[in-house]
UniProtKB/Swiss-Prot annotation:
This is Bifunctional peptidase and (3S)-lysyl hydroxylase JMJD7. Residues 124-310 form the JmjC domain. It holds the Pfam family Cupin_8. Its cofactor is Fe(2+). It comes from Drosophila melanogaster. It comes from the Eukaryota. The lineage of its organism: Eukaryota, Metazoa, Ecdysozoa, Arthropoda, Hexapoda. It catalyses: L-lysyl-[protein] + 2-oxoglutarate + O2 = (3S)-3-hydroxy-L-lysyl-[protein] + succinate + CO2. 2-oxoglutarate binds at residues 123, 172, 181, 183, 190, 292. The keyword Oxidoreductase applies.
Length: 316
């Protein structure tokens, strides 16, 4: 065992003993800003707040209501053959990191497509503050003051407020984000698999050529490689393992990961701290809204960057 591997091993052991439990903490009430900051934000620990939201959106945002109120509204939609927007797929023996086919559609048409289990998978998941940009009328059904505990702790407004709508085939493959994520489920449920940042060395990652889904004249999906202005292939680092069915023979390091699993129901809030790996699946026609807050680039970020370099040095 190298000195780097020994140091990473110490980190895994001590973090397991001191920091992370075997399940995500659950609360039955919204915490004060002080409680949230002290117990979760400052410790980079996730928490689920059960039945926290008494918003008009809960119960109101049905597919029928969305069609009647905003059915003619044009929205960005991600389309894939398998439900994995921003994920790995293979074509002609080559594995790619693949972006979805993105297009504009009427909201009513998206909802209709969700009831076709044999067709392509349509998912409203544009992470550009699409609720504010495409569906601003829906903001009136959110009582964002319920999230003051988070905003006061982060001491900043959200960078983006995103609207999510898809069927049970839509999956978000495992990844991490440089954001504090306050995730609110409006209808249905979301299933999260979470891995803390200190387990970075347990999560296998690879560098993959980047592609995007396209459709042929016959409607068949294919992957078109992305290239830069000089014609060179583009590449993306991405998590190699599927946490729902990990190939431990191929990725033995993942055996040391200790994923946390949690189901977030309608009316629940999940606080997902920055740089936590997460994989997300969902129920049919699940609707959610999440609030992204940029992370503070403080000493914790510096330590995480050091961990990235140590993990790379071990692999290299």
């Amino acid at each position: 065992m190298s000195e780097v591997e020994r140091a990473l091993d110490v980190l895994l052991q001590e973090a397991e003993e001191l920091c992370i439990g075997s399940s995500v903490v659950e609360l039955d009430r919204i915490p004060t800003a002080l409680e949230f900051c002290r117990e979760f934000y400052s410790k980079n620990q996730p928490v689920v707040i059960r039945k926290a939201l008494n918003w008009p959106a809960i119960g109101k945002w049905t597919p029928k209501y969305l069609i009647e109120a905003l059915g003619d509204r044009s929205v960005d939609v991600a389309i894939t053959p398998n439900g994995y927007a921003d994920g790995l797929a293979t074509q002609n023996g080559q594995e790619y990191f693949v972006l979805p086919l993105e297009t504009k559609m009427k909201l009513s048409e998206v909802v209709r497509r969700l009831d076709d289990p044999t067709g392509a998978v349509h998912y409203i998941q544009k992470q550009n503050s699409n609720l504010s940009v495409d569906l601003p009328e829906l903001a009136a059904d959110l009582r964002v003051s319920d999230l003051d505990f988070a905003q006061q702790s982060f001491n900043k407004p959200p960078d983006a407020v995103n609207f999510w709508l898809g069927d049970e085939r839509a999956v978000t493959s495992m990844h991490k984000d440089p954001y504090e994520n306050v995730y609110c489920v409006i209808s249905g449920h979301k299933d999260f698999v979470l891995i803390p940042p200190h387990q970075l060395s347990c999560v296998p990652r690879g560098i993959y050529p980047t592609g995007v889904y396209k459709t042929s004249d016959s409607g068949q999906f294919y992957i078109e490689p992305l290239r830069d202005e000089e014609g060179s292939d583009q590449f993306t680092e991405w998590v190699s393992v599927d946490p729902l069915s990990p190939d431990l023979a191929k990725y033995p390091e993942y055996a040391r990961a200790k994923p946390l699993k949690v189901r977030v129901h309608a009316g629940d809030i999940l606080y997902l701290p920055n740089y936590w790996f997460h994989h997300v699946s969902q129920s049919h026609k699940c609707i959610a809204v999440n609030f992204w807050y940029d992370l503070d680039y403080d000493s914790r970020y510096c330590y995480y960057r050091m961990l990235e370099q140590m993990t790379s040095a071990r692999s290299g």
